[in-house]
Amino acid sequence: MAKAKFERTKPHVNVGTIGHVDHGKTTLTAAITTVLAKTYGGAASAFDQIDNAPEERERGITISTSHVEYDTPTRHYAHVDCPGHADYVKNMITGAAQMDGAILVVAATDGPMPQTREHILLGRQVGVPFMVVFMNKCDMVDDEELLELVEMEVRELLSEYEFPGDDLPVIQGSALKALEGEEQWEAKIIELAEALDSYIPEPERDIDKPFLLPIEDVFSISGRGTVVTGRVERGIVNTGDAVEIVGMKDTTTSTVTGVEMFRKLLDEGRAGENIGALLRGTKREDVERGQVLAKPGSINPHTQFEAEVYVLSKDEGGRHTPFFKGYRPQFYFRTTDVTGAVELPEGVEMVMPGDNLKFVVELIAPIAMDEGLRFAIREGGRTVGAGVVAKIIA
């Protein structure tokens, strides 16, 4: 089978289904691909294809995830669905599947359940920016008032976690009936697709964001000055641009006097490229791995933050024993480890391998960070956890 050509013409948006176990996330995923393929063309994915999710390893963590793709007339969607609750937790914390928006699936027969709440909270913590709700199994509820009540409950729950519960789209449908080809329910899947198109804004591309380059290596070239190398994380840097060197110590400024790639001089370095940047007036000893080169004013160094964390299980190669208050592992940000002290939440005495929780971290050196930045927790070079900066404190 020939590979279909990847069409760059349409905006590419990443979404995923979240919600309580057995509320119909995978059935909905199958229904979306099936109904959209029938309506707009494209390939359908069967339920058992999606449900039989392959295991992937992201930063040493085993996650089962299914990836499907579908098109609306204006967009191309990449959609992730996870079989188990633990997979969602890991996926959202590691950022293995970054979501521009999420489809929260709530069964009308049950209303919001514990994992519904947990997924909304996780979405808030890890920075899923937009939620669209699909109320599933509405064919099994005859009472119109009951449907309204469930919708109200879901909206209130979303508002509680600072999503705009009153304004976001809620579609009442039945994934199973749509999958079986019943027209009135197929129409609800189209309505959901239209809600994704109109409610989730087109994501800002990495290249359009402010320039940032995590420094991997520093060289001194006699007669030319100091060169830092790394992969541009976002934005574009042009020869002549002023930059800040942020993290580890006090922020300094410099000017990029040259950009090289594969020993060739270029005018610019763009997101995704491995480059060397020549810095004017910067000494070799002033720069180190772990700092970032960034557009002035675009990012600040911080030492204290609230983290949402998943602690690896023993089977994943994590710790075999719990940790307690006073735990001081290394936090690996981008290119380097920084030691940090962990402050456990009130009432939590110990943390077991396989747990997920939030706690406050105080680093011994500042790191350039924004909320949403991912990190690994390591002990002597071995990964024992994964986390995301949920809230910067200082």
Curated annotation (Swiss-Prot):
Record-listed Mg(2+) binding positions: 26
Binding site for GTP: 19-26, 81-85, 136-139
Cellular location(s): Cytoplasm
Chain spans, region G1: 19-26
One example GO MF annotation: GTPase activity
Catalysed conversion reaction: GTP + H2O = GDP + phosphate + H(+)
Cited Pfam families: GTP_EFTU (PF00009), GTP_EFTU_D2 (PF03144), GTP_EFTU_D3 (PF03143)
Region (G4): 136-139
Main location: cytoplasm
Region (G2), start-end ranges: 60-64
Region (G3): 81-84
Keywords: Cytoplasm, Elongation factor, GTP-binding, Hydrolase, Magnesium, Metal-binding, Nucleotide-binding, Protein biosynthesis
GO (cellular component) term, any one: cytosol
Residue segments, region G5: 174-176
The EC number(s) this enzyme carries: 3.6.5.3
Domain spans labelled tr-type G: 10-204
Record bears the keyword Flavoprotein: no
Family annotation (InterPro entries): EF-Tu_GTP-bd, EF-Tu_GTPase, EFTu-like_2, EFTU_2, G_TR_CS, P-loop_NTPase, Small_GTP-bd, T_Tr_GTP-bd_dom
Domain of life assignment: Bacteria
UniProt xrefs under PROSITE patterns: G_TR_1, G_TR_2
Subunit structure of this chain's protein: Monomer.
Function: GTP hydrolase that promotes the GTP-dependent binding of aminoacyl-tRNA to the A-site of ribosomes during protein biosynthesis.
Family designation: Belongs to the TRAFAC class translation factor GTPase superfamily. Classic translation factor GTPase family. EF-Tu/EF-1A subfamily.
PANTHER family: ELONGATION FACTOR TU, MITOCHONDRIAL, ELONGATION FACTOR TU-RELATED
NCBIfam families: EF-Tu, PRK00049.1, PRK12735.1, PRK12736.1, small_GTP
Protein name: Elongation factor Tu
